[in-house]
Amino acid sequence: MAIKKYKPTTNGRRNMTSIDYKATLTTSTPEKSLLAAKNSKAGRNNRGLITTRHKGGGHKQKYRIIDFKRNKRDVVGTIATIEYDPNRNAFICLVNYLDGEKRYILFAKGMTVGMKIVASEHADIKVGNAAPLKNIPEGTLIHNVELKPGKGGQMARSAGTSVQILGKDDDGKYVTLRLTSGEVRKVLADCYATIGEVGNEEYNLVNWGKAGRNRWRGIRPTVRGSVMNPNDHPHGGGEGRTPIGRKSPVTPWGKKALGVKTRNTKKPSEKLIVRKRNAKK
C-alpha cells in the first residue's frame, strides 16, 4: 500500500492525500451477479425523521454482497481480482470456487491474485483461509471473527484491523481474544475467523483535504450547538457568543454529554469481557 500526495495547486489540494489504488487493485469493474441496489436513506427512518445526524448526499453506490459467513466449506477457491468497495474502507476480493460459484470476501494483507484459499475445519494457517477459533494457534492474527457460530463475521472487518488469539479455556468452550481497541474478551471456540489482517492498513493516514471530499462520501457538516437557535439545541440562543448556560455540556436531546458511560452493563455478553478497552494498564 502507498499514500499518494498532491501538489498544492489549490487550497483544497494542499496537504491532501489519498490511497494509491492502482498499486493494489486489479480491476475497476465489479462482478454483476454480486451487486445489489442501495437506496440512500440520508439518516432518516421510516417516518422521515433524522435518526443519524450528518448523513446525506454522496455518490450513488451499489452494494457488494460480501461472504462474511465463509460457509462454503472444504471447497478450494482462487482469488481472481482485488477490487474497491465504496461501502467500506477495506478492499474486497473476488473468489472463483472450483464448483463455479463466485463470492466476494474481505481483502487481507498479503493476498495476491491467483492465491488458493479454503474455509475448512482444519484449514492450513495461511492468509485468507477460514477455520474455527479452536483450531487456530495462539498468537495468530485473525479478522472477520464471528460472535455466534454461523452468524457471520462481526469483529475486525475495517481496514487495517485484526484480532489476536491470546489463549484457550481448559474446557475448550471459549477462546480469549485481544481486539484492536485493547479490549480482551472471550468468544465461543466454534466461531469461525479468517487468518490475517484486513488490508488497506494505511487508510487512517488519508488527509481528506477539503470538505467536498467528505460530501462525496455522504458526510454532512457537523454544526456546534452554541451557534444554533434555542429551539434546535440546548446550547443555542443568546446575543453573540454566549456561554452554554449549564453546568455541563449536553446532547441535542438534553442528556449529559461528558463523563457518562454509554455501554449497557446488563448485556449478557458483559460477563465475557475480561478487560475493558479503556481499562488502566
UniProtKB/Swiss-Prot annotation:
GO terms for molecular function: rRNA binding; structural constituent of ribosome; transferase activity. It comes from Mesoplasma florum (strain ATCC 33453 / NBRC 100688 / NCTC 11704 / L1) (Acholeplasma florum). PROSITE patterns: RIBOSOMAL_L2 (PS00467). This is Large ribosomal subunit protein uL2. Part of the 50S ribosomal subunit. Forms a bridge to the 30S subunit in the 70S ribosome. Belongs to the universal ribosomal protein uL2 family. Residues 222-281 are annotated as: Disordered. One of the primary rRNA binding proteins. Required for association of the 30S and 50S subunits to form the 70S ribosome, for tRNA binding and peptide bond formation. It has been suggested to have peptidyltransferase activity; this is somewhat controversial. Makes several contacts with the 16S rRNA in the 70S ribosome. One of its GO terms (cellular component) is large ribosomal subunit. GO terms for biological process: cytoplasmic translation. InterPro entries: NA-bd_OB-fold, Rib_uL2_dom2, Ribosomal_uL2, Ribosomal_uL2_bac/org-type, Ribosomal_uL2_C, Ribosomal_uL2_CS, Ribosomal_uL2_dom3, Ribosomal_uL2_RNA-bd_dom.
